[in-house]
């Protein structure tokens, strides 16, 4: 929408491009130059494609900016130049890829002395990478012509951006054949051997790290590519070279040459770990196993790698005993002399990866060196090193779960066997795993009993003990583990059995308790809610005596409030019953029950609307809501429920509008109206039948009484006692007690009325009094309007009503009802009608 209607401000670049002397820097100073370039601004692209402009853009990237410039704007133009050249504009990519002079100028950045400017190196790498991805053939051909390209890459491998460029060269070329050509070219240039030579104690730490990361990424990318391309005829030459035994031996000889350099050792171990992992691990500490029966080279470890590592297991074991020297480390727990160090931690990771391969020869060498015993000693010595504890736990779990491998034919025996699993026997007999677990557990309990802190390895120790118990019950070595436990001394075996039953069982029970509510599942929430509903605070959480409650108890909840229903609610129910037929009525299946009925207005109702406006008619919706809320909570008899009975047998033949508030007032003088509206009265019993009997005709209040407010009559009977202190109570007390039914008083005029209107008066029980209404009938429209005889207008008001008839206002709060043909003939009498009386808002 913003761009469609051209609401954005016009760019200043078009104005600048119209000038003949505009310079590149002036355009680069504009804030929206990048947006215009990516939006394919034709004039801007044509300007940038000029030879001098492209040369300037490349120069900004490869040349060091002046030192005396402000640091805030020093790299402004190099950054914008890089973004313009990498905006992926096809014309610009074509010009750069085809112009060898520009490529040579860009390539000259590698000719600078090391170390390179890291920021400019990132700009250079980004531009060359997008050219490799968009113009692979031209760029690769150009780089192949440069004999020193690989040498320069190795020279600047300490710069991270150059390492990224090497990896982009391996990944950005998508066509299979060009990619294979690049791999063969790099393999011929001995890129693997050169990277391995960098992992040497004599080299810098940055070069160690970047060279190691490059080799690791080459291994991962090659294996992923092999998995994706199953029908590849040619193996990955770089991966095959790196997996050669002589290459691994060269790598290990570099790190163990003379002095021990931690950076070189850690970098070399990272390469070995990558070669030993068949696929990328899903999470730290977990090595994904190749699916059974899958012999793909990407899912197996090369035997040459294992043989090369096996020859150096003694050197790795010496690193566990004598790591590179590290200074004493002060921690919040205490002094570490020496600390574990990154070297020993990575050696233990290497041992866990070797155990994952389950090679019998390597397992035998580890047993002879007692490497498992050494790492177990470190487990209990360094109490708070959770990285170490995790790796030791993995090693023990692998030994317990690894099936026995036959050394003669290399087959793996899956069934339970007490065969010569020497490493497992070594773990229980020589390393005394059971005894050390029991000793560490007792030491921790004594320390905690004295008020000391719990040892940091207790969680891992619990998991190791559970792993032993699990291996005893099931697993490939269950029979051997059971035999090894039986061979323990009687005292140790009894202590172990007691430990598993008591201490370990209690710990597992405590650890399995959920931190959240125990019955947090949805199917349990309903029953608990029913049982605990209404409990006191001190008893709310007590669930000991709560049994399983069936779901059927939901129906026992009673949400009914024993409060008095206001007149508005009863009136609404009466309206619904009259306007909506029952849904089981077969005769109304085809009738839309929500269809609006036609509402006819008589001149009497219009005259009333224009002349009888009162405060009650002008009340707001908020006042109605407040009144409804107040009525809802009024006290009343719990056994009496007053509702208007409506005959539902006859179809509705009249419609009504109940949009106006139905306030109630008694037939009291005007000065008492409003003060007795909310008074509480004693309810009177009402008859269930005969509510529309017109045989009882009684005189209503005197027509000479003063005019009362034009408020609707309460449409339900109330027989509550009248408060003698409320105004108007005396007037109510003087009236005779009326029966519990309503009597309609009908009157009809003769031929004198030009409108041929009929009037019927009705006596309504309003609390403890009677109130008479007038029913005006229009013969033309057959509509009836109820009016109160109290609402008399003077002669001057009659004149005002006639004026209002000429300009009627929108009719509000009218209720008209067409007479049904089956109306009783007793409804018409000889009493003359009073056309000037305002009608009452609301039906009976």
From Swiss-Prot:
Localization of this protein: Cytoplasm; Nucleus
Phosphoserine found at: 315, 550, 588, 605, 693, 824
Chain intervals with Polar residues compositional bias: 695-721, 819-844
GO molecular function, one term: protein phosphatase regulator activity
Chief place where the protein resides: cytoplasm
UniProt modified residues of type Phosphothreonine: 602, 820
Annotated Acidic residues bias: 615-626
GO CC entries: cytoplasm; nucleus
Pfam family, one: SAPS
Keywords attached to this entry: Cytoplasm, Nucleus, Phosphoprotein
Reported tissue expression: Strongest expression observed in lung, spleen, bladder and liver and weaker levels present in brain, heart, kidney, skeletal muscle and pancreas.
Presence of keyword Phosphoprotein: yes
Region (Disordered), start-end ranges: 599-844
InterPro entries, A to Z: ARM-type_fold, SAPS
TM regions (residue ranges): none
Subunit structure: Protein phosphatase 6 (PP6) holoenzyme is proposed to be a heterotrimeric complex formed by the catalytic subunit, a SAPS domain-containing subunit (PP6R) and an ankyrin repeat-domain containing regulatory subunit (ARS). Interacts with PPP6C and ANKRD28.
Function, as annotated: Regulatory subunit of protein phosphatase 6 (PP6). May function as a scaffolding PP6 subunit. May have an important role in maintaining immune self-tolerance.
Similarity comment text for this entry: Belongs to the SAPS family.
Entry protein name: Serine/threonine-protein phosphatase 6 regulatory subunit 3
Organism (species): Mus musculus
Lineage, top ranks: Eukaryota, Metazoa, Chordata, Craniata, Vertebrata
């Amino acid at each position: 929408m913003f761009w469609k209607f051209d609401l954005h401000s016009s760019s200043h670049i078009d104005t600048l491009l119209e000038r003949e002397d505009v310079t590149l820097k002036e355009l680069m100073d504009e804030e929206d130059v990048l947006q215009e370039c990516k939006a394919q601004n034709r004039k801007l692209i044509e300007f940038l494609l000029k030879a001098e402009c492209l040369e300037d853009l490349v120069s900004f990237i490869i040349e060091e900016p002046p030192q005396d410039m402000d640091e805030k704007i020093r790299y402004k133009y190099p950054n914008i130049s890089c973004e313009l050249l990498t905006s992926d504009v096809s014309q610009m990519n074509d010009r750069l890829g085809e112009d060898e002079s520009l490529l040579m100028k860009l390539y000259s950045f590698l000719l600078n002395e090391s170390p390179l400017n890291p920021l400019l190196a990132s700009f250079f790498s980004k531009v060359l990478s997008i050219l490799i991805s968009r113009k692979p053939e031209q760029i690769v051909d150009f780089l192949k012509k440069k004999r020193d390209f690989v040498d320069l890459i190795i020279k600047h491998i300490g710069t991270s951006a150059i390492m990224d460029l090497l990896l982009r060269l391996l990944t950005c070329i998508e066509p299979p054949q060009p990619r294979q050509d690049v791999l063969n070219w790099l393999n011929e240039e001995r890129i693997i051997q050169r990277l391995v030579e960098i992992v040497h104690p004599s080299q810098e730490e940055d070069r160690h790290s970047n060279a190691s990361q490059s080799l690791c990424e080459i291994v991962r990318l090659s294996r992923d590519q092999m998995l994706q391309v199953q029908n590849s005829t040619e193996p990955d030459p770089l991966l095959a070279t790196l997996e050669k035994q002589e290459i691994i031996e060269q790598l290990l000889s570099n790190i163990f040459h003379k002095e021990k350099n931690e950076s070189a050792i850690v970098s070399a171990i990272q390469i070995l770990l990558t070669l030993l992992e068949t696929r990328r691990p899903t999470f730290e500490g977990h090595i994904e196993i190749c699916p059974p029966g899958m012999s793909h080279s990407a899912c197996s470890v090369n035997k040459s790698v294992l043989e090369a590592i096996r020859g150096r297991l003694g050197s790795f074991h010496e690193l566990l005993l004598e790591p590179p020297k590290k200074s004493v480390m002060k921690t919040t727990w205490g002094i570490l002399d020496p600390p574990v160090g990154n070297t020993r931690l990575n050696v233990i990771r290497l041992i866990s990866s070797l155990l994952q391969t389950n090679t019998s020869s390597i397992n035998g060498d580890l047993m002879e060196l007692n490497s498992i015993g050494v790492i177990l000693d470190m487990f209990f010595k360094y109490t708070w090193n959770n990285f170490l504890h995790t790796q030791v736990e993995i090693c023990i779990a692998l030994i317990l779960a690894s099936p026995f491998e036959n050394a003669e034919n290399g087959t793996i025996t899956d069934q339970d066997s007490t065969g010569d699993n020497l490493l497992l026997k070594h773990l229980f007999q020589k390393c005394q795993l059971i005894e050390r677990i029991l000793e560490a557990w007792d030491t921790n309990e004594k320390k905690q009993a004295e008020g000391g802190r719990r040892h940091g390895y207790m969680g891992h120790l619990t998991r190791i003990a559970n792993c032993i118990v699990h291996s005893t019950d099931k697993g490939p070595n269950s029979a051997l583990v059971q035999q090894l436990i039986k061979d323990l001394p009687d005292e140790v075996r009894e202590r172990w059995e007691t430990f598993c039953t008591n201490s370990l069982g209690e710990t597992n029970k405590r650890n399995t308790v959920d931190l959240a509510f125990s019955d947090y599942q949805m199917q349990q929430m309903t029953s608990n809610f029913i049982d605990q509903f209404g409990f006191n605070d001190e008893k709310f959480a007590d669930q000991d005596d709560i049994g399983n409650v069936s779901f059927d108890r939901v129906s026992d909840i009673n949400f009914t409030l024993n409060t008095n229903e206001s007149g508005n609610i009863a009136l609404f129910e009466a309206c619904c019953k009259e306007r909506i037929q029952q849904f089981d009525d077969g005769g109304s299946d085809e009738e839309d029950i929500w269809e609006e009925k036609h509402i006819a207005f008589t001149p009497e109702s219009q005259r009333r609307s224009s002349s009888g406006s009162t405060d009650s008619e002008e009340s707001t919706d908020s006042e109605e809501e407040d009144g409804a809320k107040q009525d809802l909570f009024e006290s009343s008899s719990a056994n009496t429920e007053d509702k208007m009975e409506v005959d539902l047998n006859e179809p509705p033949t009249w419609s009504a509008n109940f949009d106006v508030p139905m306030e109630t007032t008694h037939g009291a003088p005007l000065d008492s109206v409003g003060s007795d509206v909310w008074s509480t009265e004693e309810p009177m019993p009402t008859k269930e039948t005969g509510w529309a009997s017109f045989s009882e005709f009684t005189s209503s209040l005197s027509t000479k009484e003063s005019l009362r407010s034009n408020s609707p009559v309460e449409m339900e009977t109330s027989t509550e006692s009248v408060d003698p202190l409320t105004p108007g109570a005396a007037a109510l007390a003087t009236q005779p007690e009326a029966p519990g039914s309503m009597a309609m008083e009908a009157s009809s005029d003769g031929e004198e009325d030009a409108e041929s209107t009929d009037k019927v008066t009705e006596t309504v029980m309003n609390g403890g009094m009677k109130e008479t209404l007038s029913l005006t009938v229009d013969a033309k429209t057959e509509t009836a309007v109820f009016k109160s005889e109290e609402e008399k207008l003077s002669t001057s008001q009659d004149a005002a009503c006639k004026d209002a008839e000429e300009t009627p206002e929108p009719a509000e709060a009218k209720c008209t009802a067409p007479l049904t043909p089956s109306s009783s003939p007793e409804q018409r009498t000889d009493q003359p009608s009073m056309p000037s009386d305002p009608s009452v808002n609301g039906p009976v």
